[in-house]
UniProtKB/Swiss-Prot annotation:
Source organism (scientific name): Klebsiella pneumoniae subsp. pneumoniae (strain ATCC 700721 / MGH 78578)
Keyword set, alphabetical order: ATP-binding, Cytoplasm, Ligase, Nucleotide-binding
Annotated compartments: Cytoplasm
Residues that hold (R)-lipoate according to the record: K134
General function of this protein: Catalyzes both the ATP-dependent activation of exogenously supplied lipoate to lipoyl-AMP and the transfer of the activated lipoyl onto the lipoyl domains of lipoate-dependent enzymes.
Family designation: Belongs to the LplA family.
Matches recorded under NCBIfam families: lipoyltrans
Binding site for ATP: R71, G76, A77, V78, F79, K134
Catalytic activity: L-lysyl-[lipoyl-carrier protein] + (R)-lipoate + ATP = N(6)-[(R)-lipoyl]-L-lysyl-[lipoyl-carrier protein] + AMP + diphosphate + H(+)
InterPro entries xrefs: aa-tRNA-synth_II/BPL/LPL (IPR045864), BPL_LPL_catalytic (IPR004143), Lipoate_ligase_A (IPR023741), Lipoate_protein_ligase_C (IPR019491), LipoylTrfase_LipoateP_Ligase (IPR004562)
UniProt GO cellular component terms: cytosol
Assigned EC number: 6.3.1.20
Phylogenetic lineage: Bacteria, Pseudomonadati, Pseudomonadota, Gammaproteobacteria, Enterobacterales
Protein's UniProt name: Lipoate-protein ligase A
Amino acid sequence: MSTLRLLLSDSYDPWFNLAVEECIFRQMPATQRVLFLWRNADTVVIGRAQNPWKECNTRRMEEDHVRLARRSSGGGAVFHDLGNTCFTFMAGKPEYDKTVSTAIVLAALNSLGVTAEASGRNDLVVKTDSGDRKVSGSAYRETMDRGFHHGTLLLNADLSRLANYLNPDQKKLQAKGITSVRGRVANLVELLPGITHQQVCEAIQEAFFSHYGERVDAEVISPDNTPDLPNFAETFARQSSWEWNFGQAPAFSHLLDERFRWGGVELHFDVEKGHITRAQAFTDSLNPAPLEALAARLVGCQYRAEVLQQQCEALVGDFPEQEAELKELSAWIAGAVR
């Protein structure tokens, strides 16, 4: 019986693909070597310890229907579209070795006519007249008895969108998370015009088979053809939940400030696990009571635009004379935290 397993995803859903990855990693036999090839439609994927409000322009992501997905490995934030090919290598210990999987990807690129090399801990680069250009980034995860190496290859990604979603609004945001490093990148299509996801996947598969000296049939998976994986439904539900993607953010503080015709407002929030643990309101308004009441109401709430907006609008019943101000405040808060 082969010790290899090859999975190909037909789904562009990042939550589906990451749930598949998680289930296989947890349940694979320690003697198995797994290759999983996949790609995501418009998604910002953040590292396990990152703060989405710090790393991402969450408001623009919402406007453009870009998903947020938190992975289980560390590292920085990346933007995925269908111009990225994603790969995951898994193996039990002591065989797990990220240098082996890196060598397989480099061999695949070489077979396509691209000479690349490893740079630092996480990247693959090609040398150009303008210097090294990054074509692949990776992240890793290890447990007591197994490990995985996953990463992306830039084929024909819309690089202009990296800045759209990975550069947050310039807010007074202080955080304890990890800040992403955004280096010079290049698409493989610049070196190999017409290169496709299918060609890259086939090259990686062949390099995988060649390294281990055996072959195996691919398992093609999709939401309509889900793999037989115990607890997959529960894993997918967690992977797609707000509590995982946003609520797992490291503790941070956020300061919002704005001047309205009726006065200036400062809101100070301390947020842990996606919930407000402390809220303070400061204002030079002649009627500060609604803001003081709002600060008290927000403690314990999820740090979500719609939740904060609802809490603000709920105060209209207590302060009907300030209805116009509260509605204006509500709209501003909703926009500021998205």
